[in-house]
């Protein structure tokens, strides 16, 4: 029996990496009976057959798991936002951060296309990013002339997953970091201010200290797993301020003696962050009941 990590899934075949050696495996029938499927990122025990093939017998407990697309045991989620084309959006950034925290993932913010933005645009974005740095988020800026290896060297060891809307340059980033990948890229639509996802499946690529992956389908953000009462925990600044509210179950919407709203009025919590919290709270409150 060998132990390795699933690095790719195509047509029901799980490719497992064992210290640089790859094996094509399939899960045993017992997984189907349990209605459980291995996912990319899983640590698995498998039995080798025919030298480079085998059957998965056991999936180790997951530290965390992203549902869409399915990836497990993520050490850091890099949220990729472009300075321009598509334009930088704090609302979208906050939504990605909520997703990250809801799945117990450690987020990092990466701003691409630094070189394509005007000086005024970059200054405005940097002022905004200081707010996120103050909250505690690691942030980086890159352009086409950046040292991509040095950028990645700042990231955690283990599995790094790139997330972000289509067109922000995730595949371009990976191609610049590892030119041998030759991943497909697409121009963004001027009318829609976004691109089409060019990544069709999740695959882990080797890097120093671990793996790196792009995520297809991550542009369609889904909050169905989050209840409105949980949302405040996923806005870090609001969560910390909320510990001083009069009522323990305060959701910082209409409740009296709310410390969060007091800090918003003082400007200590940015108005735009609170607005995004309210918008998402209302979206979750108004969604249809699932049966």
Curated annotation (Swiss-Prot):
One of its GO terms (cellular component) is cytoplasm. Zn(2+) binds at residues 245, 250, 252, 258. Keywords: Cytoplasm, GTP-binding, Hydrolase, Metal-binding, Nucleotide-binding, Ribosome biogenesis, RNA-binding, rRNA-binding, Zinc. Binds 1 zinc ion per subunit. Pfam families: RsgA_GTPase (PF03193), RsgA_N (PF16745). HAMAP family: GTPase_RsgA (MF_01820). This is Small ribosomal subunit biogenesis GTPase RsgA.
């Amino acid at each position: 029996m060998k132990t390795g990590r699933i690095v790719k899934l195509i047509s029901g075949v799980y490719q497992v990496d064992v210290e640089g050696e790859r094996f094509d495996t399939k899960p045993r029938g017992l997984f189907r009976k349990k209605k459980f499927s291995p996912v990319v990122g899983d640590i698995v025990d498998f039995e080798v057959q025919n030298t480079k093939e085998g059957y998965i017998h056991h999936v180790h407990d997951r530290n965390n798991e992203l549902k869409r697309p399915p990836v497990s045991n993520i050490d850091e989620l890099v949220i990729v936002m472009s300075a321009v084309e598509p334009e930088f959006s704090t609302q979208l950034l906050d939504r990605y951060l909520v997703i990250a925290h809801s799945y117990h993932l450690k987020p990092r913010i990466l701003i691409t296309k630094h070189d394509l933005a005007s000086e005024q645009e970059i200054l405005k974005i940097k002022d905004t990013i200081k707010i996120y740095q103050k909250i505690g988020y690691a942030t980086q800026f890159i352009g086409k002339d950046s040292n991509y290896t040095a950028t990645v060297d700042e990231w955690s060891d283990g599995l790094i997953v790139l997330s972000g809307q289509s067109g922000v340059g995730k595949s371009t980033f990976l191609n610049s970091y590892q030119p041998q990948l030759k991943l497909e890229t697409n121009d963004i639509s001027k009318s829609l201010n976004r691109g089409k996802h060019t990544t069709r499946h999740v695959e882990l690529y080797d890097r120093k200290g671990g793996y790196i992956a792009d995520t297809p389908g991550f542009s369609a953000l889904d909050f169905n797993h989050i209840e409105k009462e949980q949302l405040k925990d996923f806005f870090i600044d609001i969560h910390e301020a909320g510990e001083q509210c009069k009522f323990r179950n305060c959701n910082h919407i209409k409740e009296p003696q709310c410390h969060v709203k007091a800090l918003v009025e003082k400007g200590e919590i940015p108005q735009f962050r609170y607005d995004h919290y309210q918008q998402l709270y209302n979206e979750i409150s108004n969604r249809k009941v699932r049966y």
